[in-house]
């Protein structure tokens, strides 16, 4: 969509029409060009901050903010930020903790690269649901490991599973969704709000982990993150449509219609 829209936006309409005809034929190309022109007309017309408070747009922006905050509040970053404490509680010494931290970084990198191939093959919605559901189950197991005082390799295996699940789903796909769900006329402002919300959520997650861990213990903390992932799964299932192979205009219409 970005290449196609870019051609229209830079007056390379013949190139855009050629691309669209190759995709879906003459009638499809004409419909898409008309839809794109209408979208750009809205984008270039005068808009104010009050447009963000239109009820239908507020629901879309609210969904975007939820997606951004959920990417952080799913809890995975506490594993990166507090890896020493987590592995220490699992019975590892200093050398073991350092090795495990290196392994978690490698797993994160590998499965981030995997996401490059799966985002268009599997779709955005299935990957977001896989990530939230997978983390929910993984946290339930990890919390149980701490509750029953299981230590060593089993805890490492569960932690690596959580990191792999996050790296190929919620971590990259959140940014893909946020770039696609907003109407052109408010996309810049809406993205700014979502990015701000994401970093605020990251800060809150980081500063609350230790107090929560003291109050609930390692098991209760990860069970709590599991409940948050359950809530995220339910909201994503109910509110987020599949955006794969859809134009930005189709996504906008679907979201405003459902909202």
What residues fall within each predicted segment?
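Short intracellular "coupling" helices and adjacent cytoplasmic loop segments at the cytosolic face
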Residues: 22-32
């Amino acid at each position: 969509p970005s290449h196609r829209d870019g051609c229209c936006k830079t007056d390379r309409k013949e190139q855009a029409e050629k691309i669209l005809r190759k995709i879906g034929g003459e009638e499809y190309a004409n419909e898409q060009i008309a839809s794109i022109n209408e979208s750009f007309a809205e984008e270039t017309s005068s808009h104010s901050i009050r447009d963000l408070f239109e009820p239908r747009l507020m629901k879309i922006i609210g969904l975007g903010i939820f997606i951004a905050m959920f990417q952080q509040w799913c809890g995975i970053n506490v594993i990166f930020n507090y890896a020493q404490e987590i592995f220490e509680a699992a019975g590892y010494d200093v050398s073991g903790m350092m090795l495990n931290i290196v392994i978690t970084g490698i797993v994160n990198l590998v499965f981030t690269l995997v996401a490059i191939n799966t985002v268009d093959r599997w779709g955005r919605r299935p990957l977001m649901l896989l990530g939230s559901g997978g983390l929910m189950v993984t946290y339930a197991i990890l919390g149980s490991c701490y509750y029953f005082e299981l230590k060593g390799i089993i805890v490492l295996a569960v932690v690596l599973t959580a990191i792999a699940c996050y790296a190929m789903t919620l971590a990259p796909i959140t940014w893909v969704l946020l770039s696609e769900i907003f109407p052109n006329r408010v996309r810049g402002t809406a993205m700014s709000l979502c990015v701000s919300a994401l970093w605020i959520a990251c800060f809150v997650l980081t500063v609350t982990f230790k107090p929560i861990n003291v109050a609930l213990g390692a098991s209760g903390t990860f069970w709590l993150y599991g409940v948050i992932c359950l809530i995220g799964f339910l909201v994503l299932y109910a509110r987020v449509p599949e955006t794969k192979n859809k134009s930005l205009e189709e996504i906008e219409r679907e979201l405003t219609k459902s909202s």
